[in-house]
UniProtKB/Swiss-Prot annotation:
Binding, substrate: 71-73, 84, 88-90, 98
The protein's name in its UniProt record: Deoxyuridine 5'-triphosphate nucleotidohydrolase
Organism ancestry: Bacteria, Pseudomonadati, Pseudomonadota, Gammaproteobacteria, Alteromonadales
GO MF assignments: dUTP diphosphatase activity; magnesium ion binding
Pathway per the UniProt entry: Pyrimidine metabolism; dUMP biosynthesis; dUMP from dCTP (dUTP route): step 2/2
Chemical reaction(s) catalysed: dUTP + H2O = dUMP + diphosphate + H(+)
Gene3D superfamilies the record matches: 2.70.40.10
Keywords: Hydrolase, Magnesium, Metal-binding, Nucleotide metabolism
Segments forming a coiled coil: none
Length: 152
């Protein structure tokens, strides 16, 4: 069963020239988001540009959130990743989805109208409440971190 999520189309080319984000395969975790630009743009090495996706969503369910993640091929082949590394969309956010596009590569990258730029993944959320303690119960790891377990 799929969870219904409200979506607004902010760019009329979505649904006519470009499809609404959807899962590419039955096993896909993410839906591709497109660069809904007015014209193609070149992203210089080291440059970060905010790109509209042409949609807004309202998750509405506080047990869910959406995350915007980079597409693996763009990052590996061209150095195109997210400027904020991960975009977190809270369940009560209703504004436009934007992608912070960062060229961490050494060559300029041209982004065309409608290019698939990032992916949208829905994840479960647990809202925690802190419980103040003076000491933690012992664990096998304790305070070990940052390389504590080695690489082999």
């Amino acid at each position: 069963m799929k969870t219904p999520i409200e979506v607004k189309i902010l760019d009329s080319r979505i649904g006519s020239q470009f499809p609404l984000p959807a899962y590419a395969t039955p096993g896909s975790a993410g839906m591709d988001l497109r660069a809904m630009l007015e014209t193609s743009i070149q992203v210089a090495p080291g440059e970060t540009i905010l790109i509209p996706t042409g949609i807004s969503i309202h998750v509405a369910d506080s047990s869910l959130a959406a995350v915007i993640l980079p597409r693996s091929g763009l990052g590996h082949k061209h150095g195109i990743v997210l400027g904020n590394l991960v975009g977190l969309i809270d369940s009560d956010y209703q504004g436009p989805l934007m992608v912070s596009c960062w060229n961490r590569g050494s060559e300029p990258f041209t982004l065309e109208i409608g290019d698939r730029l990032a992916q949208l993944v829905f994840v479960p959320v647990v809202q925690a409440e802190f419980k103040l303690v003076d000491e933690f119960d012992n664990s096998s790891r304790g305070e070990g971190g940052f390389g504590h377990s080695g690489t082999k």
